[in-house]
């Protein structure tokens, strides 16, 4: 599973790198590329809004009170644990830096 994750991460980074390189070439070639960029941003924004609305509709259709309570309880417990561990880690770093 770790190799699949790394492969997926590599492919995502490769695609993003190609997109950035293509965007830079478009800006260098065409001074009116801001209009194209605006169209792409609007398109991505509309796709995102559509996906978000679909996810919210699906959530509302499958909403269960008991599951929601369990999720809230799990979130509060995990955030409390993370706060504790973060403060311990910070204390250890400060102790290491002070040299006590």
From Swiss-Prot:
GO molecular function: phospholipase activator activity; phospholipase binding
Region (Lipoprotein lipase cofactor) location: 78-100
Keyword flag Secreted: yes
A Pfam family this chain is assigned to: Apo-CII
Region (Lipid binding) location: 66-74
Major subcellular location class: secreted
CC annotations in GO: chylomicron; high-density lipoprotein particle; low-density lipoprotein particle; very-low-density lipoprotein particle
Domain of life of the source: Eukaryota
GO biological process, one term: lipid catabolic process
InterPro entries the UniProt entry points to: Apo-CII, ApoC-II_dom_sf
Location of the protein in the cell: Secreted
Keyword vocabulary terms for this entry: Chylomicron, HDL, LDL, Lipid degradation, Lipid metabolism, Lipid transport, Secreted, Signal, Transport, VLDL
Record PTM: Proapolipoprotein C-II is synthesized as a sialic acid containing glycoprotein which is subsequently desialylated prior to its proteolytic processing. Proapolipoprotein C-II, the major form found in plasma undergoes proteolytic cleavage of its N-terminal hexapeptide to generate the mature form apolipoprotein C-II, which occurs as the minor form in plasma.
Signal peptide, first to last residue: 1-22
Function: Component of chylomicrons, very low-density lipoproteins (VLDL), low-density lipoproteins (LDL), and high-density lipoproteins (HDL) in plasma. Plays an important role in lipoprotein metabolism as an activator of lipoprotein lipase.
Protein family per UniProt: Belongs to the apolipoprotein C2 family.
Name this protein carries in UniProt: Apolipoprotein C-II
Gene: APOC2
